[in-house]
Amino acid sequence: FNKIGPLIKSNQIINDNLDKFIGPYNENKKEEIKFKMWKNFGKTFVEYLFLKKFRENNSHIKIKGENTLLKIIDENKPVIFVSGHFANFELMSMELTRKGIKLATIYRPLNNYFLNPFMEHMRRTYVCRDQIKKGLAGVRESINYIKNNFSIALMIDQRVSEGKRLPFFGGMALTSTLPAQLATKYQLDIVPIYIARDKNDDFEIEIYEPIKVSDVDNNEINKIDLTIKLNKIIEQMISREPGHWIWTHNRWK
């Protein structure tokens, strides 16, 4: 992946995205981030083949903020988990379900029609059984899951055509307002979650403190403010280890 990655079509998108993140003149830093990104991408791809082993043995995964997770389980009330495509992001939902969270995850199918069935099978079998396909039907399905006491997990770091243009690393990026909409409508906490890969390819999942939402937040302005806050959290997560985020998406299109 380190050799092939720079040759693919999205390399220009990656460079443009990194220009927004660190500026157009720091070429050495850009190359370092790209090298780490492709290396992590390759490792994550290989790890898909071993998701069953990760499911059976989580000794390589630690959780920071487990008390927050235990409190969520104890309260037995749905929450909205939000994150991005960091390190091996699939392991976050896997660990949430392993710990006893009733969870449904919103996903975007891969553009590769040959690879997508395999990925969906692996996710349903070893990561999280309840998968919701992104889209209008997926929103309705999410509401049904919430009414059945399921928490919802979704990635909010990618561009969504139906989103709002909101600040993200100094530019304006189409951003999903779905977490804010669901949280304010059903009075649910929003819980950011992050995963880091260390040099030994062990992982630490961090459960952030819940963001409390009240009924006074259920208007359009407050939903936008809440979404901007979530964007800032994603920015902070990316900045912790830029090489472990996927820079190939045209986030600012």
Spans of features found by a protein language model:
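Catalytic core of membrane glycerolipid acyltransferases/transacylases, capturing the structured
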Residues: E75-G135, S161-L166
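Active-site metal-coordination segments of metallo-dependent hydrolases
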Residues: L7-I13, N112-Y113, A173-S176
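Short, flexible loop segments at the rims of nucleotide/cofactor-binding pockets, characterized by
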Residues: R55-I61, C128-K133, F168-G170, V216
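Hydrophobic alpha-helical segments typical of transmembrane helices
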Residues: I14-N17, M37, M92, F118-M119, ...
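Membrane-anchoring hydrophobic helices of lipid-metabolizing enzymes
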Residues: F1-S83, F118
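A conditional alpha-helix N-cap/helix-loop micro-motif detector
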Residues: S59-I63, F86, N112, I132-L136, ...
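Non-catalytic C-terminal accessory region of glycerolipid acyltransferases
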Residues: K29-K30, F35, K71-E75, R98, ...
